[in-house]
UniProtKB/Swiss-Prot annotation:
It comes from Bacillus subtilis (strain 168). The lineage of its organism: Bacteria, Bacillati, Bacillota, Bacilli, Bacillales. This is GTP cyclohydrolase 1 type 2 homolog. Signal peptide: none annotated. The keyword Metal-binding applies. GO terms for molecular function: metal ion binding. Belongs to the GTP cyclohydrolase I type 2/NIF3 family. Pfam families: DUF34_NIF3. GO terms for cellular component: cytoplasm. A divalent metal cation 1 binds at H68, D107, E336.
Amino acid sequence: MAKSVNGQQIIQLFEQFSPKAYAVEGDKIGLQIGTLNKPIKNVMVTLDVLESVIDEAIEKEVDLIIAHHPPIFRSLKHISTDQPAGRLIEKCLKHDIAVYAAHTNLDVADGGVNDLLAEALELSETEVLAPTYTDPLKKLAVYVPKEYEEQVRAALGNAGAGHIGEYSHCAFSSEGIGSFKPLDGAKPFIGEVGELELVHEVRLETVFPKSVEKAVINAMIKSHPYEEVAYDIYPVEQTPAEKGLGRVGTLKNEMTLKEFALFVKDKLDVNGVRMVGDADSMVKKVAVLGGDGNKYIHHAKRKGADVYVTGDLYFHVAHDAMMLGLNVVDPGHYAEKIMKEGVTRKLTSMCNDKKFGVNIFVSETDTNPFTFL
C-alpha cells in the first residue's frame, strides 16, 4: 500500500541523489518559495520556473516543483505583485505550490545534468572536467543480529552507502558474539532487564561519502531491530572520488566536427547548434558541460578534448577557443532540458522503493526563449 508523504521526505530523498554540499559556493539552491511541511501528492520537474510553468502547475494541482534553474537567483530588493517576479511568487503562495531548486549540485551529481548529457552523446570512459568538490569517505561498522543482516545491508545500500566505482551495495560482514545487559528503563528487543545477554551477531561494514552520512545513519537506525544501535563511524584514508562540473569522454567512432555538430543537434534534440573550428577536423575525445561553460574552455583543452560542447558561448571566448585550437559546439543553454526526464526517472524510482504515494511528472511547458528561423 502506498504511503502518504510530505515535502521534507521527498527532498530528503532527492538530496541523497543531489546533495546540497555539491553546489558551488554562493549558489542559490534549496527551498525558494513556500513550505515543505505539508502533504505532497503531485511533483513537477522543470528546467525553469516561469509564470507559464506556474500556470501549468496550478492546472495540474502540483504541490511541489523541483527546478534546475532557481527562480530567485539575484537578490530581490522588494516583492511587487505588479512585477513578473512578484506575480510568480504570489501565484505560488496563493496556490500553495512549493518551489525547490537544485542548480550546480545537480550539475555535479552522479546521474545529474552532465552525466545525462554525456550519456545522450554516447560518451564512454567519462571523468570529471572541472573538479569542484571532494567528498571525504567514512566507514561504518554496525552490529546486527544475524537474522536482520540482509534488512540492514539493503537499507544502507539504498541510502547511498557501499558505492565503490561502478559497484553499489558493497559491504563486508563477519560473525561473532555480542553481549549486553539491559538496565532499568530499557525495552530490549532481545533479553531481559538485569540479565547479561549473549547474542549471535554480525559486524556489518561499509563505506559512504560524508555528504550522505545523515541519510545512512537514519536508514541504519530505522532498519535495525535494537532500540540502542551499537555502531562506529570513522574516517578512512583512501582518496575519495572527485566530484565536479562537466564530463570528458570518448566517442565510439571518430567523426568530423561538422558530423559531430549534427550528431549533437540530433541527440540533444535542439533546434540548432553553433560551431567553432574546422568543419573537416576529426573529433574523438569530447568535453561537455551543461549551461554556460565559458570559463572552462582551458579545462577542456588541458583534458585533451578535441571538441567542447557547452552553451551560451561568448563571442570573445569563441576567439579564445580558436587560438587554443579547441573546437566548440554550442547547443544552447536549453539543452539542459534533458534533466527533466532524468530527474523524473530517478526520483520516481527512489519514491517507488520507499512506496511513497506520489506522482512525479515532467513539465510540458517549453521555456526556451529563442526561436530559430
